[in-house]
Amino acid sequence: MFRKQSRPGHSPVSLYLDTESEQTPAILSNTLTDVLSTVPETSEIVIVCIGTDRSTGDSLGPLTGTLLAKNKLDNFKIYGTLASPVHAVNLEEVLADIELRYTSPYIIAVDACLGRVKNVGSLHFEDGPVYPGAAMKKNLPPVGQVHITGIVNVGGMMEFFVLQNTRLHVVMQMAESLSESFVLADRRLQGKKLIKKAYQDRPVPIGGKTVKHEA
């Protein structure tokens, strides 16, 4: 169902997940929670969902963003929906806006990609940025401290035609799995924050006096 590689002292380098597995949202949300728990509290976590609804295969990003926007998320800011997509034309402008709007933003990029036949329908979480438009030989800025790509179809030739003729069912299944993963991760991150706050606010008896615990 998945392949995971890691380095000592680092978050997972490579994680492949099959979106047909019911375990995928739980596994991916655990990975996201572990990685994002190390992000400074002063940083805003921004999910940039890249793509366009003008191409079925390239609609994974905006579909995911639209599903996420329907949820009340405490720890994530969302860019890229069906109504307001992030694509090749406005990508640099969106990234500039994020840098101006947020202090030390931590970006998670979500994008569709093409790959091997055996991996179609898989999600791939990886450290480092994604390079949007690589399959179409576009020269666009890299996006994200980490990224998640969904392998929507087979690559190698006639990429534009392949993206246009990708099954919507495959893309929608990925978007739903991604959305569920982020929602679960958001709840877990919020739970950790509440536990930490409760611990810090807990009165501690010291020398006959009760004082608040200081982390």
Locations of regions flagged by a protein language model:
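N-terminal catalytic or cofactor-binding beta/alpha core of small enzyme domains
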Residues: 1-107, 112-215
